[in-house]
């Protein structure tokens, strides 16, 4: 079995060396690495060219302005081999990542897609709190600890990619979720390989987290996934609080503090639930959990604000144009 690993990049000069080094030192190195640059304005292409000049099995595609879905499609289309591995810049691969994926695929000729596991990088107090706030904890199925499917830790047959016409190309995020669902709905067989581990670096500050999740929010709606996130935030939480605030302002303005107190209590409860849900991933003392709660609460508030702002952006910028297309058609520029 020969494997081409496809990586979309843009402005990744800080992380691209680590990714390339980890790919080239795999216990089972890829036969080819295809990198699509989506319009970098930093030194990313020059760094990649250094590796090519030094004889690494790397190909660079300069795609101009390209979002991740288009980058993956261009890379997959020009890849030389039947099996396609996907990962991203900013991801740290375990040394046996590709070996584990390939072994799983070779063990059963009926397998079409192998997806590995992943872990958030929690090397600071903030990142640990961020993981508690928004990263779903692993679950156990039949004694095997699993994570949701993650395109940055995936190996699949080219045929599966071709059958669904590749990734949506006009989405900044969630294009991988649509792609995976379409492949599964087309009847291709998925298997999980827990030994294929990658490490996902989280945003390091509240502001960078907010900016990233505004993008996620807008594109989540464009992908047709509103009910999976924003609906709960807008209707279950803030819809009720808005009604309560309106009632107080109309009937008892002196109690305007009450909706604010209710919001803070709600944030406290949600933070407590998140900490409890992750107690096995991040065990801690009561005092440590209290400190985490003080950080998880503003993180949840920031995520809510991002969900709301992204929804407003979608309403103002995308709603009418997108309503004339299905999410998948819109994602492919149809």
Model-derived segments and spans:
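Short, well-formed alpha-helical segments that are part of the catalytic scaffolds
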Residues: 11-25
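A conserved acidic beta->alpha catalytic loop
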Residues: 22, 29, 37-46, 91
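Acidic donor-binding/catalytic loop of UDP-sugar-dependent glycosyltransferases
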Residues: 43, 89-104, 181
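Glycine-rich, basic loop-to-helix element that forms the pyrophosphate-binding segment
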Residues: 63-79
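Short aromatic/hydrophobic "clamp" motif used to bind/position activated sugar donors
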Residues: 84
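Conserved donor NDP-sugar-binding/catalytic core segment of glycosyltransferases
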Residues: 96-127, 201
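A recurrent flexible, glycine/aromatic-enriched loop bordering the glycosyltransferase active site
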Residues: 120-121, 137-156, 172, 178, ...
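Catalytic donor/gating beta->alpha subdomain of glycosyltransferases that bind UDP-sugars
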Residues: 168-228
